[in-house]
A protein has these predicted regions:
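Recognizes extended acidic, P/S/T-rich segments that occur
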Residues: 1-28
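Extracellular fibronectin type III
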Residues: 28, 40-63
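Hydrophobic beta-strand segments within extracellular beta-sandwich modules
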Residues: 34-35
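Sequence/structural signature of beta-propeller modules
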Residues: 61-111, 358-367
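Beta-strand-rich domains and repeat architectures in extracellular enzymes and scaffolds
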Residues: 103-141
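Repeated scaffold domains used in trafficking and secretory/extracellular systems
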Residues: 115-122, 164-171, 211-224, 263-272, ...
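Loop/turn-rich, solvent-exposed surfaces of beta-rich toroidal or solenoidal domains
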Residues: 261-309, 327-329
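Conserved blade-ending motifs and adjacent loop-strand segments that build the rim/top face
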Residues: 307-334
């Protein structure tokens, strides 16, 4: 604390303008003291200036990532919620016991920093786990993946991603997990997930992606089916998503464009079942009275077996359209159920928030 105290050098930070340095692995609820000094190099020798006056900083206690539902803590509370009572089609297809709370909505431990502003985005099934992506609305903390047990539907751990991207899309190809990264998609091996689970820690930091493939437009959503990674961009009008063949899964994955498919405006998520049924979510805005509002889940049977000569796959007419509560986002299929994720629990303006991943019998979404 005093000028006579012994200080340990933490870092040498280079830069000619304002610079910053993030110090990790500090003890919670502990006061640390810091002094800085300017330096320069003369003929290869580092010359340091006088140390500054000591400045103190106390680390805060970081709460564990929340496991429970943000708004409705029990089944009784949820079944009395405006969304459950109002959206009859969702209610009739829903299996409450297979549904589960979206973790991290109250607070998320992001590598030792507490974040209460995570917004859920994408959902996929990867082996024994559901993976949920989320980004920090305030853009202060890195984006994350919540790992949830497929069998127990309970939150296990968090994977902290190496960027603050919006991570709207996530998919699993049987070997690698793919994730949105602006005008690119990045991949990392499934072993990252299993290692994070086996580590038994509250979070694991992913230092870098295994591969990054650049695109010509923003990757807002994605889904995997039959060795093709389908990637699309959220748009206010009908748009075209692209299907990419995945190369070198076991080594350094890369993508080759192969197909296209038209999708409706305001598409937020896609997923596929083993028979090739495509489940597509559309949503925009939190209030019905707002211009352009929509929130629905659609099912299609695309003509995958007979693409046109230019690679276009017809999605065909929707088999069924199910009106959903506001802000439906990612979707995943496990067994005979479709799981839908919502971001509405973050927005105070939403009168029909859903703080759970809702499991719905797929047969009721296609008939």
């Amino acid at each position: 604390k005093s000028s006579e105290s012994v200080y340990q050098q933490t870092a040498v930070v280079k830069g000619t303008d304002t610079v910053s340095y993030l110090i990790k692995s500090l003890t919670q609820n502990t006061t640390y003291y810091y002094r800085v000094a300017a330096y320069c190099e003369v003929s290869g020798t580092q010359i340091e200036g006088k140390l500054s006056t000591a400045v103190s900083a106390k680390t805060a206690a970081v709460s564990a990532t929340s496991k429970g539902a943000k708004k409705y803590s029990t089944k009784a509370a949820f079944t009395k919620s405006p969304a459950y009572k109002t959206y009859k089609k969702m209610r009739s297809a829903m299996n409450y016991n297979k549904s589960f709370a979206i973790p991290g909505m109250k607070t998320t431990n992001v590598a030792g920093f507490s974040c209460t502003t995570m917004v859920p985005q994408g959902l996929c099934l990867a082996g024994s786990y559901f993976l949920i992506t989320a980004y920090d609305y305030k853009n202060e903390q890195n984006s994350v993946i919540y790992v949830v047990s497929r069998s127990s539907k309970s939150y296990i751990t968090t994977i902290v991603l190496p960027s603050k991207a919006k991570v709207g899309g996530i998919a699993y190809d049987g070997t690698n997990v793919w994730i949105s990264k602006g005008k690119a998609v990045a991949s990392f091996p499934y072993s990252v997930v299993t290692n994070a689970v086996n580590a038994g820690t509250s979070y694991t930091e992913l230092a870098a992606y295994k591969s990054v493939s650049t695109l010509d437009s923003t990757a807002s959503f994605m889904g995997y089916y039959n060795n093709v990674l389908w990637i699309g961009t959220f748009r206010q009008a009908t748009s075209t998503m692209k299907g990419y063949q995945i190369n070198n899964k076991a080594t350094l994955p890369s993508l080759s464009p192969a197909y296209t498919m038209d999708v409706p405006s305001k598409t937020q998520g896609i997923t596929f079942d083993s028979a090739g049924t495509m489940i597509l979510t559309r949503s925009y805005r939190t209030k019905k009275a707002k211009s352009g509002y929509i929130s629905q889940l659609r099912t299609y049977k695309p003509s995958f077996a007979s693409p046109k000569s230019n690679g276009k796959v017809l999605k065909n007419t929707a088999m069924k359209v199910t009106t959903m509560p506001p802000m439906v986002k990612g979707a995943a299929v496990y067994g005979t159920y479709t799981y839908a994720l919502f971001s509405s629990s973050y927005y105070k303006s939403c009168k029909y928030p859903v703080d759970r991943v809702i499991a719905m019998k797929e047969s009721k979404l296609v008939e």
